[in-house]
């Protein structure tokens, strides 16, 4: 027996909204879905030229697409993004919460503004976006959030983003239960060391051991690719994943099994700064 989502995908072109879709994993996913003949909404914050280039590539790959400028760090931006989708498409089949940003600091150096912005950039857009997506998924759909290895392992200076990713994975489980009666599946994809343009920012921070030393300890002996991440997300968006919900799929080449980097790998670089005092 086909689910509502399976029946609708057989009858019409699927509409997929991807935040942060002008580069990296988001762009690769957009092209992957385009090759399936879908309509892709390319959300971007600043670089209109890059977003329009992605739209052109989507159309060359056999799909349809359009770009929407919206800063999802603001509640107004999230609302404007989904208003545009509602006006132009009238419905939504897939919502992929991909955009992310963070500062990388020791916990004792974080100020209230860092915490507020991390919440506003990473967690709130996913929750508010999911609320809006449900209203447009009148016949079932799929929601996928991007997570990372830092949600389950402690990296130097990664607490702020890792904490947000852990929260996202928790929200995925709650949403899966609440949205199931609507025929909507909600999952997360947790990437390890993925060879993307973001890896430079997310990994190369003070206190991390050399990346090659970590790669040598991963069972797969290499970083993942953005295409491997996109293929996993696309699987969760497809009919073959109809009975998967509330889960976090790990794409890390075995990284989390052996759990590097080890503290000993970093040596003195992992030493904590002096304990702050109230007089400091």
From Swiss-Prot:
<feature type="active site" description="Proton acceptor">
    <location>
        <position position="165"/>
    </location>
</feature>
<feature type="binding site">
    <location>
        <begin position="194"/>
        <end position="196"/>
    </location>
    <ligand>
        <name>NADP(+)</name>
    </ligand>
</feature>
<comment type="similarity">
    <text>Belongs to the short-chain dehydrogenases/reductases (SDR) family.</text>
</comment>
<feature type="binding site">
    <location>
        <begin position="71"/>
        <end position="72"/>
    </location>
    <ligand>
        <name>NADP(+)</name>
    </ligand>
</feature>
<comment type="function">
    <text>Involved in the biosynthesis of the antifungal antibiotic ansatrienin A (mycotrienin I). Catalyzes three of the reductive steps involved in the formation of the cyclohexanecarboxylic acid (CHC) moiety of ansatrienin from shikimic acid. Can use 3,4-dihydroxycyclohexa-1,5-diene-1-carbonyl-CoA, 5-hydroxycyclohex-1-ene-1-carbonyl-CoA and cyclohex-1-ene-1-carbonyl-CoA as substrates.</text>
</comment>
<dbReference type="Pfam" id="PF13561">
    <property type="entry name" value="adh_short_C2"/>
</dbReference>
<dbReference type="InterPro" id="IPR002347">
    <property type="entry name" value="SDR_fam"/>
</dbReference>
<feature type="active site" description="Proton acceptor">
    <location>
        <position position="158"/>
    </location>
</feature>
<feature type="binding site">
    <location>
        <position position="165"/>
    </location>
    <ligand>
        <name>NADP(+)</name>
    </ligand>
</feature>
<feature type="binding site">
    <location>
        <begin position="22"/>
        <end position="25"/>
    </location>
    <ligand>
        <name>NADP(+)</name>
    </ligand>
</feature>
<keyword id="KW-0045">Antibiotic biosynthesis</keyword>
<dbReference type="GO" id="GO:0016491">
    <property type="term" value="F:oxidoreductase activity"/>
</dbReference>
<protein>
    <recommendedName>
        <fullName>1-cyclohexenylcarbonyl-CoA reductase</fullName>
        <ecNumber>1.3.1.120</ecNumber>
    </recommendedName>
</protein>
<keyword id="KW-0560">Oxidoreductase</keyword>
<comment type="pathway">
    <text>Antibiotic biosynthesis.</text>
</comment>
<dbReference type="InterPro" id="IPR036291">
    <property type="entry name" value="NAD(P)-bd_dom_sf"/>
</dbReference>
<dbReference type="GO" id="GO:0017000">
    <property type="term" value="P:antibiotic biosynthetic process"/>
</dbReference>
<comment type="subunit">
    <text>Homodimer.</text>
</comment>
<keyword id="KW-0521">NADP</keyword>
<feature type="binding site">
    <location>
        <position position="98"/>
    </location>
    <ligand>
        <name>NADP(+)</name>
    </ligand>
</feature>
């Amino acid at each position: 027996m086909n689910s509502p989502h399976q029946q609708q995908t057989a009858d019409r072109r699927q509409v997929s909204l991807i935040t942060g879709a002008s580069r990296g994993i988001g762009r690769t996913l957009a092209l992957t879905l385009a090759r399936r003949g879908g309509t892709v909404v390319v959300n971007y914050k600043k670089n209109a030229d890059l977003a329009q280039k992605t739209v052109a590539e989507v159309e060359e790959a056999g799909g349809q697409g359009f770009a929407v400028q919206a800063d999802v760090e603001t509640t107004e931006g999230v609302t404007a993004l989904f208003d545009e989708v509602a006006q132009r498409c009238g419905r939504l089949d897939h919502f992929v919460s991909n955009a992310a940003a963070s500062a990388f600091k020791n916990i004792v150096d974080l100020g209230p503004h860092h915490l507020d912005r991390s919440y506003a950039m990473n967690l709130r857009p996913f929750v508010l976006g999911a609320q809006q997506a449900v209203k447009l998924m009148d016949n079932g759909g799929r929601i996928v959030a991007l997570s990372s290895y830092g949600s389950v392992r402690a990296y130097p200076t990664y607490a702020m983003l890792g904490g947000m990713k852990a929260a996202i994975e928790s929200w995925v489980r709650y949403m899966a239960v609440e949205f199931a009666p609507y025929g909507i599946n909600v999952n997360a994809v947790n990437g390890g060391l993925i060879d993307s343009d973001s890896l430079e920012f997310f990994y190369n921070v003070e206190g991390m051991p050399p990346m090659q030393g970590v790669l040598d300890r991963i069972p797969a002996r290499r970083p993942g690719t953005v295409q491997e991440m996109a293929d996993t997300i696309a699987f969760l968006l497809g009919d073959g994943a109809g009975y998967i919900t509330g889960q976090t799929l790990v794409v890390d080449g075995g990284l989390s099994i052996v759990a590097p980097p080890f503290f000993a790998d970093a040596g003195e670089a992992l030493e904590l700064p002096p304990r702050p005092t109230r007089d400091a």
